[in-house]
Amino acid sequence: MPHVSAPVIEKLCCGVNVDSYGRNKLHNLIINSPIAEHPAGIKELVDKGINVNAQDINGWSALHFAVQEQSYTAVKALLENGADTDLLESNGNSALHKAVFYSNNNNDIISLLLVYGANPDTVNNHGVTPRSLAQVVENSSIVALFNKCNIIG
């Protein structure tokens, strides 16, 4: 596992707990650092007491950002450190909604979220579920994955 440079962690651990967007140090690690540093940085920040499930002013958790970045290693590290797959951002989207939208036919993150209990039938503010979104974007492999997991809507 790559080591996060001391200056990166020092910068993340100094100063205010959240920025003007309501993002904590974990959000900013995911957004601003190289993907290779995510797992070690996540572990170190969580060990220092950073809330893995904190949400910014738009309701995004670090997990939402990791999914958007398509960082499997960050998603895995967040889930291993207690990230909640059911947190909804301001539009009612879960991390699984984001994973379906950003998947680009790579279903590894979707599979991982399902293993950690993500619900493909969570309805967002527009009445859309991850399952229905997979059908709309015509990603039959995700639809098959949901069905293979025997998750019935």
Model-derived segments and their meaning:
Residues 1-48, 57, 151-153:
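Intrinsically disordered, low-complexity regulatory segments in ankyrin-centric signaling systems
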Residues 10-14, 43-51, 76-84, 111-119, ...:
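Ankyrin repeat domain, specifically the short helix-to-loop turn at the C-terminus of the second helix
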Residues 17-18, 52-55, 85-88, 120-123:
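Ankyrin repeat boundary signal
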Residues 41, 73-74, 108-109, 141-142:
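Conserved ankyrin/ankyrin-like repeat signature
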Residues 88-126:
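Ankyrin-repeat and related helical/solenoid repeat scaffolds used for protein-protein interactions
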